[in-house]
Amino acid sequence: MYAKLNTLPALLALLAFGSVAHADDTLQSRVDETIRPLMAEHAIAGMAVAITYNGQAHYFNYGVARLDDQQPVSSDTLFEIGSLSKPLTATLAALAQATGKLTLADSAGQHWPELQGSKLEHASLLNLGTYTAGGLPLQFPDNVTDPASMLAYYRQWQPEHIAGTHRRYSNPSIGMLGMLAAKSMGQPFPTVMEGMLFPALGMSHSYIQVPTAQLPRYAFGYSKDNQPLRVTPGMLDAEAYGVKTNARDMLRFVQANLNPAGLNKDLQRAIAMTHTGYYRVGEMTQGLGWERYPYPISLERLQAGNSPAMALESQPATRLAPPESEPSDSLFNKTGSTGGFGAYALFVPSQNLGLVMLANKNYPNSARIKAAHAILNALDKNAAPH
């Protein structure tokens, strides 16, 4: 009898381990059957996928970081994440508000006096962070190459719409927010990101400028004809699309958004600000950096919210007054691309579930969303409305 009682805990532990191992194997097979065909269809050299579910992190790596030396992708491979940098920039701006350095209601001119007399002088920092300043374009014109030409561009810019009435997705818009947030903290943007925000989030291998010692981990992106690419320098590139990171760090950021309780109070408040809804654009609610949808959500609705029209065209926007705090059932997401990289992240707080997909090929957003939605469905059978 004594022996039987002693073996019971061991047996239960073995059964529990077997159950976890089976769940891991099932998840591995679901991710494999989604990612491998995706890579084949779009000629993607390498991908890193990271999933957090019920507090557990899972990592899945495919292909190579570099075609020349066939270095395998790992969870430590550094990828360019393009505009998936924007939620990090937004978190910095929200942290600047949480620590009393600025408020999102401030005008751009309050923090950049050189804008005095321009159409952007009275645009709010919230307008800049939600792409509602009146129609700033996706990219700067080619002749904006230095701080002087950037200021000249902002000073002569003419709005298409009254501020706060339309959303036009824009690097010069949120890029200015990031620049002014860092300025309010008294440091250059790369310094405050690498020296303060990344460490506070536990992102120990995330960079604006990849240090020499980390270059062996930095993947090459690839063009459609498999020529190696790295992001091209440009004005406010760091603020709008400049983060290089790995799957582990990006999953930590997603986990911080799912469960910020372990972070300092100012950072908790900042993350809540990025989840707040400020404008409604169709079925999407624009937060700071993150874009929010009611959950569950169909594949078609999620693809529509990440369509070329949403990235390239002005869309009517309805201001939410007061701003709308995070509903109980929401999905947050953001895509990101550079010339040779494609990234995507989503998380669903009510399901304690998050996903990061990093690739060294800029492939269509619709394909990223389809793959992510398939994995989401494997984890939550109610992910799509019935």
State what each model feature region is.
Residues 24-79, 103-106, 110, 148-156, ...:
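Short, conserved catalytic-motif segment at the N-terminal edge
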Residues 59, 66, 118-332, 337:
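Short, surface-exposed loop or secondary-structure junction motifs
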Residues 334, 342-361:
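Short, well-ordered beta-strand elements
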Residues 1-9:
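Bacterial N-terminal signal peptides that target proteins for export
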Residues 16-18:
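N-terminal signal peptide c-region/cleavage motif recognized by signal peptidases
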Residues 35, 49, 55-57, 78-105, ...:
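Active-site SXXK
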Residues 10-11, 21:
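Cleavable N-terminal signal peptides
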Residues 282-284, 295-296, 362-386:
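Short, gly/Ser/Thr-rich active-site loops of penicillin-recognizing serine hydrolases
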